[in-house]
A protein has these predicted regions:
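Conserved G1/Walker A P-loop phosphate-binding module
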Residues: 1-97
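Extended helical scaffolds that flank P-loop GTPase cores
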Residues: 1-15, 39, 52, 74, ...
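Cofactor-binding loop segments of dinucleotide-utilizing enzymes, especially the Rossmann-like FAD-
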Residues: 17, 51, 129, 158, ...
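Acidic active-site catalytic centers that drive phospho-/nucleotidyl reactions
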Residues: 22, 100, 161
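Conserved C-terminal guanine-recognition region of P-loop GTPase G domains, centered on the G4
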Residues: 72-96, 106, 112-186
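Canonical P-loop GTPase G-domain recognition
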Residues: 161-226
Length: 279
């Protein structure tokens, strides 16, 4: 086993339609904003975030690199950029890399902008807006994904609080689960804004739907880390019917992430909500 293989972290993409909550999800996972407030991720090439203090740069289509300024990211030429690389010191990036993709159906952006980054991905956190969940355009893109990637991916029904009645929530959740059966490792309804606003209030955190999601996410990253220790090939590149390397080692999680996982698991075990209890 090479040093490169030992050190490779899982690479998890944040994907979905425009305004489905990807930026809010990124802020939630990172514990803060990765981009300046005036910068809109939907207007950028994919943004690959890793742990560290390296200055930001962009990777050109021919593999070259050029430094970029965080305050001027929107001036980076999207059509000529494969990916923007950002580095931060935060807990989640000690466990994995995050790649924030632009919206999949932006009429002002060619799908080539995000499709060329798919070979770098091990798993996806897919955000679908609760009021128009799992549109045909989303299903069409997801049909491109190989089983190896799907087996570790999570579907988030975002802005779940916008569904007013319990009946509507159950109807949407059941429909999405039926239409995506076998295509994701797990599906969670969630209000990302409520989760962000919860702070250290674990009751509000759990009520937002974030508790069960985070518990599953950390477990999923643990499994992906063991797979990444055996192969430098991201799971998007593993064809259907091809065996995924067996896990070989455990993940050492930062204590803060472990505490968050334990607290989320305790709250999830105590819930009486039949929809969330079924997750």
């Amino acid at each position: 086993m090479t040093d490169a293989q030992q050190s490779r972290k899982p690479r998890i993409a944040l994907m979905g339609e425009f305004s489905a909550g990807k930026s809010t999800l990124s802020n939630l996972l990172l514990g803060g904003r990765a981009l300046p407030e005036k910068v809109t991720a939907t207007r950028l090439a994919p943004v690959w975030m890793s742990y560290g203090t390296t200055p930001p740069y962009r990777v050109t289509l021919d593999g070259g690199t050029e430094p970029v300024s965080l305050d001027r990211l929107e001036s980076v030429p999207v059509a000529e950029t494969r990916v923007i690389r950002l580095f931060m010191e935060c807990d989640i990036l000690e466990l994995c890399d995050l790649i924030d993709f632009p919206g999949i159906s932006d009429p002002n952006m060619s799908s080539d902008v995000w499709e060329r980054m798919l070979p770098e991905v091990d798993a996806v956190l897919w955000c679908t807006h609760a009021t128009q969940a799992w549109r045909q355009s989303e299903a069409a893109v997801w049909a491109m994904m190989p089983d190896a990637l799907r087996d570790f991916s999570i579907l988030l029904i975002t802005r779940y609080d916008k569904l007013i009645s319990d009946k509507d929530r159950r109807r949407v959740f059941q429909r999405v689960r039926l239409e995506t059966e076998g295509q994701f490792a797990a599906t969670f309804p969630i209000s990302l804004l409520q989760a962000l606003q919860a702070g250290d209030d674990y009751d509000k955190w759990d009520a937002s739907g974030a508790g069960p999601f985070v518990t599953h996410l950390v477990d999923m990253i643990d499994k992906l880390t063991k797979v990444a220790a055996r192969t430098d090939q991201p799971l998007y590149n593993i064809a259907n019917g091809t065996a995924i390397p067996e896990p070989v080692r455990a993940t050492i999680m930062p204590r803060r992430v472990q505490r968050l996982r334990d607290a989320a698991q305790t709250d999830a075990d105590d819930t009486d909500d039949p929809v969330r209890a079924s997750l």
